[in-house]
């Protein structure tokens, strides 16, 4: 209900499921430019699991998202963060059908560490990832992956990199059509095929940019009072507003 459907990305999703079914190095990390749909991949996988449209090894799996900011919040003393994260890991170890999703996974490198020698999040996760006790899905941009995540060799070699590239215009149009009904219901207006096609072609690369191109028009239309036939409509412009 709350998650938008994943349209396309069948090759990347199939690759993700193959990695998760391994005995070792069974942790995929989605790497791509901002806006290509890395988080949507994890949401799409969750929906496939819910529909049981996955291999037997992944049936009844539960995906948990790690709120790293919440774990760090209010940690005044050395060891507070370590204790919280170890508590999360211990709880996940009790659930053999659990997968941990960490958005912006490069942020765990150095998270919680202090000059006094306390361990950061990545060092706490490494042992359980190496043993296969916990499976993890991460996401990061190309720049952050290269500059931060990949430099921690002991951590990055536990993961299988899956590149999420920008979709072609034809696939972006299909993505927009798949999400059209939800945006129409929200705004109370109709998106025409030509409007979606124009948004995809003008945004060129990213579905999120195409959505951003169509949303302001709908928002403006739905927030203004309806124009009656006997009332002249004011047309705003850049010069006068």
Specify the residue positions occupied by each region the protein language model found:
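Low-acidity, Ser/Thr- and Arg-rich intrinsically disordered low-complexity segments
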Residues: 209, 218, 222-223, 229, ...
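Conserved catalytic segments around the Walker B and adjacent sensor/switch elements
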Residues: 27-29, 53-70, 158-161
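Conserved C-terminal "switch" segment of AAA+ ATPases
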Residues: 55-56, 146-157, 161-213
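Walker A/P-loop
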Residues: 17-58
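Conserved catalytic/switch belt of AAA+ P-loop NTPases
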Residues: 20, 86-90, 104-135, 141-154
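N-terminal pre-P-loop "Q-motif" helix
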Residues: 4-16
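Loop/turn-to-beta-strand initiation segments
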Residues: 26, 62, 93-100, 131-137, ...
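Short glycine-rich substrate-engagement loop in P-loop NTPases that contacts/grips substrate
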Residues: 65-92
């Amino acid at each position: 209900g709350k998650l938008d459907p994943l349209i396309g990305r069948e090759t990347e999703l199939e690759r993700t499921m193959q990695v998760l079914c391994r005995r070792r190095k069974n942790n995929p990390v989605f790497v791509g430019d901002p806006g290509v749909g890395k988080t949507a991949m994890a949401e799409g996988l969750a929906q496939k699991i819910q529909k049981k449209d996955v291999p037997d090894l992944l049936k009844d799996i539960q995906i948990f998202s790690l709120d790293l900011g919440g774990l760090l919040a209010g940690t005044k003393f050395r060891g507070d963060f370590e204790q919280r994260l170890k508590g999360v890991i211990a709880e996940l170890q009790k659930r053999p059908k659990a997968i941990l999703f960490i958005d912006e996974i490069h942020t765990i490198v150095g998270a919680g560490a202090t000059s006094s020698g306390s361990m950061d999040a990545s060092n706490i996760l490494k042992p359980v990832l190496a043993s296969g006790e916990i499976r993890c899905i991460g996401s990061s941009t190309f720049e952050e992956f290269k500059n931060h995540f990949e430099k921690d060799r002991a951590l990055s070699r536990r993961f299988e990199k899956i590149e999420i590239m920008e979709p072609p215009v034809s696939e972006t149009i299909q993505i927009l059509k798949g999400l059209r009904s939800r945006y129409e219901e929200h705004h109370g207006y109709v998106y025409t095929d030509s409007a979606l096609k124009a948004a995809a072609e003008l945004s060129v690369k990213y579905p999120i940019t195409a959505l951003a191109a169509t949303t302001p028009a709908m928002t403006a239309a739905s927030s203004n009072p309806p124009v009656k036939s006997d009332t002249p409509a004011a047309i705003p412009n850049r010069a006068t507003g």
